[in-house]
Amino acid sequence: GGGPLTYDFDRSEFWRSIPLWRNVDSKTFGDFRWQQRNSVTSIPGIKEALCELASSALISDIEAGLLKTPMNIRLTPYIFSRIHWENFENDPIRRQFLPLGSQFVPDHPQVMDDSLAEDVDKATPHLTHRYPDKALFLPITLCPVYCSFCTRSRVVGGSTAVKSKSAYGAKSKEWDSTFEYIRNHPDLEDIVISG
């Protein structure tokens, strides 16, 4: 009691189990720019990363999942390497980022694109003001990874087979109206910045 909290981080080179990154050193692998540049964003990217680990059944199941989901895929090598590919059907990380066609269930009849009704309370193109002292500022639409169940899949990650998306692409010059709105609402005390 009373001492600093410590965490036992995994110091192993776990990514070496993925054929594409077998020869990547820890300094390179730990570089966030390298992670972004080498993100897996397609079926060919999955095949390239996994090589012999990618069975045709796995690839077909992921392809079937991508035909049903409104979100594209984007996984950094770090996240991709954390998936236990020997038991991919049940892996919780895979479930979060890579949908399988075999695991889809029908949508609820009242499913909505904007399930959190953020657009209803939009004060500016990039600011949702729902509560008197709180607002949500969405300055960008790029995430380092794309979660398959993202509540903003209607605007993030580009169009898919089942969802056509307009180019949201927030730009800094478009933020002026948001900053002006915030300045004109001194009751706002808490601004959540998200993507």
Report each predicted region and the residues it spans.
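Cys/His-enriched microdomains
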Residues: 141-145
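Conserved Radical SAM active-site core
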Residues: 98, 111-138, 148-195
